Regions:
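Gly/Ser/Thr-rich phosphate-binding loop
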Residues: 1-26, 40, 47-51
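Generic alpha-helical secondary structure
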Residues: 133, 137-141
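Alpha-helix initiation/capping motif
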Residues: 7, 115, 122-123, 148, ...
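Hydrophobic, Leu/Ile/Phe/Ala-enriched alpha-helical segments that form helix-helix packing faces
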Residues: 1, 55, 144-148
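Alpha-helix termini
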Residues: 18, 86-90, 148-153
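Conserved ATP-binding/catalytic segment of the ANL
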Residues: 29-42, 47-55, 59-130, 134
Length: 166
């Protein structure tokens, strides 16, 4: 695993662009390393089910002998989570060797491959939309902590609420 700094604006737009750590708007992420040989992992557009190229942010889908089969007694949730199929693959796909009709696990994790390593940027369910722009809660929390010495890092949380909370 390694730490890499990305252009925060481009990352929010779904593109991983590496920058120096001291660049304005740089956002640091630590990789999860490479994918185990027994596992296949692809980054997919969660709306279309199409595989995305390295450097694009999408949902991680997994396939392998160590992936569960489903949720006990919850067939609908099992189909939604463990029954995904790739709508389109890239040339030299990370799904190479996996049959086209194979079921994939939708992890709900967002991230990308960059430099051959896997980076997780957040969770789909945690993503917030402000003025039509996708925002990670961690970014809001870091901005609040950086805004004032009175706010301690790790003591701020951002989340959505069904109604306006003031």
């Amino acid at each position: 695993p390694r730490e890499t700094w990305f252009d925060g604006e481009r990352l929010a737009a779904g593109y991983a662009v590496g920058v120096p750590a001291d660049s304005p708007g740089a956002v640091g992420h630590v990789s999860c390393g490479v994918v185990a040989r027994s596992l296949r992992a692809v980054v997919v557009d969660p709306e279309t089910g199409e595989e995305l190229p390295d450097g694009r942010v999408g949902e991680f889908w997994l396939h392998g002998p160590n992936v569960g089969r489903g949720y006990w007694g919850h067939p609908g949730e099992t189909r939604r989570t463990f029954g995904a199929t790739l709508a389109a693959r890239l040339p030299h796909s990370r799904a190479e060797g996996v049959a086209p009709d194979t079921n994939w696990l939708r992890t709900g994790d967002l991230g990308m491959f960059f430099g051959g390593e896997l980076y997780v940027t957040g969770r789909i369910v945690d993503l917030m939309f402000i003025d039509g722009r996708a925002v990670y809660p961690q970014g809001i929390e870091a901005t609040a902590a950086d805004a004032s010495p009175l706010v301690r890092r790790g003591y701020v949380t951002a989340f959505t609420a069904p109604e306006l909370v003031i």
